[in-house]
């Protein structure tokens, strides 16, 4: 069976069993702020399982698209090198929300897998696991389904804690949970590996193909499991894995779905279609990239966009490794659409968009990849040892745009590892430099000298026609810019707004026949507007006629935020006083940032008042008025001017809400205040002495922020078994209970220390008439060790004591010397030696000292220093 046939068979089978076919949700989780990407079929049903959402059906079946790259579930570094790791995969799943339970779920799974009508897998090839104490599931499998006991495996708590098992599923530390039952397929003795639960279980012979999760408990904060009133079922079967089984292959990359993508990848790259890891990387990555872009993710330097960029660049690097010349990755999109478009129509609808995004990102990366690879090869040739230094990894990241995992791929091919800690140190240092940077960097704008006054038409237009007046590359005038080159374009007329007054410059593109210049930013020097960007295709020359196009969506969102800053400024003067002056701002399409003079933190009630005032003006939906006048007339009308801003003879006065807000401003704004829709403050804090900062969102971004806050509130209420009305009371009770438990724990630890003291005193050695006790008590904190040393000094008399512990991944040390010995031996001196041995520091009084370190493996050696310390000191 082909993969598409298996997908449809699964959906059809469960429809026959009364399930509602539900479309795959977006890869961008719509109801879970804790997830970077959708990574399981149950994600879209989370609220159903929690009882917070009721749907028209109680049985559902889906084929869910999933991505695991970045965050907790990150398979990126393994992709291409193993048979089953992917950045994108399909999860077939059937779900019951308080409807059927174990018996039906198990019966459905077995019927679909083994019935001649459906997959017709040989029963003798299937193994089943259950949670160790789930006798109900075990009996159903053995007594009703007929799976022999020798192919049944009970899996206990194999992860070091109660209910921490491969066969016990939890949504979190609290909440719905329950045992699960996994079905494995035996690929045969020619493949290495053992059954689940055996020492060889990590081999490839026995592969899990289906997991049935039985949500029958609710785990409370105290760890107790309480039966759910309406148990549910959540199952998942990887389409790629079951396709491999049915197509009699042992690697997911050998299934029909991947064979077409591998062939298309090889064709686009111009290489042979053989079993190369790099080709598998490309074929895998086109799926995750295509689906992510179709769902609205774009390459960027943060969040989901950065993960997408990493995947694209990893694919490009592996393509180049196989000999790709020029852009190739975007060419594989057509094969992806042909293979999966019928099941996921968004691929068909977004095909051209996906191709444009991939081509643009690939071209941008290609400009620096070759040079970066040469630098890396040079550094690796000079490398001594097997660890690539953090500064090398950072240089590639910072200068050439190499994500760390891309450098890691190259290093792994040479059996090298990365100094990740060193990389993080370099990143921290860069952040410090960025905060302190001012005007010391190279400013190519200052090198642009052109006697041109660009005519600005952007107040009323976002498109137009213009002539190229001048071109600059790295600050030097040039006659043309070729494809792939970055530069600055100056036009005689433009709708692009140049960065000013805190509003970012416009982005978009310039088109001249086959030539296209992508504008990433617009600035101004003198009267000239500088369009910064890169030639995406063709060649652009001075004198060329171009069509201009501002990015409308970015412009629209930015102007709403800009108008909101004016309303906020006026509201601040109302609430805080007339002393408030704007000290700076940054307005882009995502949010607004407003710095202002004020002498203290703003109180919560003042923040609420600010929001109320601004939103009241928004609801009035008054027209935003502009007027060109001279500076003196504007000031007489009460227009506020920015401190330190230079104004010409003619100024633009912007009024909102009549006289509510009147300011001098040359920026782009909303037509009416109602266009802003909603205003929400998301943060307030100090940035300098006497300067405060407010960050806020508007419109759709504000609504998204409120929805996220509501989701988090619901999550918090669920964790404490409360609701919105009693959440504070519940949290107060939890905090008080925790305080009491901590007090009880301290008392128990004191008792345990006392008992331990009795046992330990007999282990002391006699060294030159001094009792010496040096031992480790892992798990004890410093407070407990101090109490124990005090007790031991009383018990032992003339003594030197050194106790150590590994507590929360750190070494804790306490040393004690009885007072009759402090003239000869000092606890602080002993502690300095012991702490240094574990990579730390320590010190204290002559009779008592504390210290610690990070090298737990050296703790025993540190404790061994006590005896020679006494021998040398007496």
UniProtKB/Swiss-Prot annotation:
Main localization category: cytoplasm
Originating species: Pseudomonas syringae pv. syringae (strain B728a)
PANTHER family to which the protein is assigned, alphabetical: ALANINE--TRNA LIGASE, CYTOPLASMIC, ALANYL-TRNA SYNTHETASE
EC number: 6.1.1.7
The protein, known as: Alanine--tRNA ligase
Molecular function GO labels: alanine-tRNA ligase activity; aminoacyl-tRNA deacylase activity; ATP binding; tRNA binding; zinc ion binding
GO biological process: one example: negative regulation of DNA-templated transcription
Cofactor, how bound (note): Binds 1 zinc ion per subunit.
Pfam families tied to this protein: DHHA1, tRNA-synt_2c, tRNA_SAD
Cell location: Cytoplasm
Catalytic activity as recorded in UniProt: tRNA(Ala) + L-alanine + ATP = L-alanyl-tRNA(Ala) + AMP + diphosphate
Similarity-based family: Belongs to the class-II aminoacyl-tRNA synthetase family.
Record key words, sorted: Aminoacyl-tRNA synthetase, ATP-binding, Cytoplasm, Ligase, Metal-binding, Nucleotide-binding, Protein biosynthesis, RNA-binding, tRNA-binding, Zinc
Annotated binding of Zn(2+), by residue: 562, 566, 665, 669
Cofactors named for this entry: Zn(2+)
Domain characteristics, as noted in the entry: Consists of three domains; the N-terminal catalytic domain, the editing domain and the C-terminal C-Ala domain. The editing domain removes incorrectly charged amino acids, while the C-Ala domain, along with tRNA(Ala), serves as a bridge to cooperatively bring together the editing and aminoacylation centers thus stimulating deacylation of misacylated tRNAs.
Biological role: Catalyzes the attachment of alanine to tRNA(Ala) in a two-step reaction: alanine is first activated by ATP to form Ala-AMP and then transferred to the acceptor end of tRNA(Ala). Also edits incorrectly charged Ser-tRNA(Ala) and Gly-tRNA(Ala) via its editing domain.
A GO cellular component entry from the record: cytosol
